[in-house]
Amino acid sequence: MKPENKIPVLTRLSDEMTAVVNFQQPGLPPWPADGDIETQRQYYLLERRFWNADAPSMTTRTCAVSTPYGDVTTRLYSPQPTSQATLYYLHGGGFILGNLDTHDRIMRLLARYTGCTVIGIDYSLSPQARYPQAIEETVAVCSYFSQHADEYSLNVEEIGFAGDSAGAMLALASALWLRDKHIRCGNVIAILLWYGLYGLQDSVSRRLFGGAWDGLTREDLDMYEKAYLRNDEDRESPWYCLFNNDLTRDVPPCFIASAEFDPLIDDSRLLHQTLQAHQQPCEYKMYPGTLHAFLHYSRMMTIADDALQDGARFFMARMKTPR
């Protein structure tokens, strides 16, 4: 797609989204476009500090979980002494960026709104770790906590997965992995998915949207994919291209959220339409005027907070004893 033919999304954003795009953090240097991956990771962490400030206070605990690939750090957010369910969170960042600190506010808000313990999983990043390592680490973490629930005051009879962007793919892929490999870590009552990618290689939205403002040009998306996958054959794997998995049966209820001007929105639309066509429980919600990654900006965007609360309500409604 010739760049001039793309939709000029910056002229169509909501006032809140425009304010975020135009916001300049004092003293923040420009994005190190030519820097190595570690430099970009450090910049991402620095840039996210502002957006993670003023988050709800609650009890947190860090735990290193042994996996076949080594220890994986997890962080438990406990808004109250006992929890009716456990929600595992996978952060976004194109498989190559992000950690528990870059998504701290999101997880704290989810814990507050659900009243449940949220466990953030600091899975290994690409390209140092490649598919399916992050999924297998997630499964190992779930297995660990299902076996040690009493030590952490967890209720793992009912669990859920949640994630944004690449983390949304990992959340759904991990739930399908548990189903397909017959691994039981608890009853998966819901999966909360914010603007994920689920396996499309091309789409109308990928042609019309994406630019320097969101880091999701076609070249960017290709780079993330090449960093994550081991080889070209992995593109068709049913835990990467999730549309190659069986979505006609036993898919946990999915809350599918999208951003209006996201090049990945067609992934969410197709996922919703596929699940709906096969009577799999799901709910789709598009948030108007937003760009990819808007969930981070709840300090300035009420719609970001709305999106978190919508996901929390979806999760709570599927508990045996809703709050």
Swiss-Prot record:
Class of enzymatic activity (EC top level): hydrolase
Subcellular location: Cytoplasm
The enzyme's E.C. designation: 3.1.1.-
Active-site residues from the entry: S165, D262, H292
Keyword line: Cytoplasm, Hydrolase, Serine esterase
Entry-linked SUPFAM superfamilies: alpha/beta-Hydrolases
Motif (Involved in the stabilization of the negatively charged intermediate by the formation of the oxyanion hole): 91-93
HAMAP family, sorted: Acetyl_esterase
Name of this protein: Acetyl esterase
Native species: Salmonella typhi
GO cellular component: cytoplasm
The family this protein is said to belong to: Belongs to the 'GDXG' lipolytic enzyme family.
GO molecular function, one term: carboxylic ester hydrolase activity
Any matching Pfam family: Abhydrolase_3
Family annotation (NCBIfam families): PRK10162.1
Function summary: Displays esterase activity towards short chain fatty esters (acyl chain length of up to 8 carbons). Able to hydrolyze triacetylglycerol (triacetin) and tributyrylglycerol (tributyrin), but not trioleylglycerol (triolein) or cholesterol oleate. Negatively regulates MalT activity by antagonizing maltotriose binding. Inhibits MelA galactosidase activity.
UniProt subunit comment: Homodimer. Interacts with MalT and MelA.
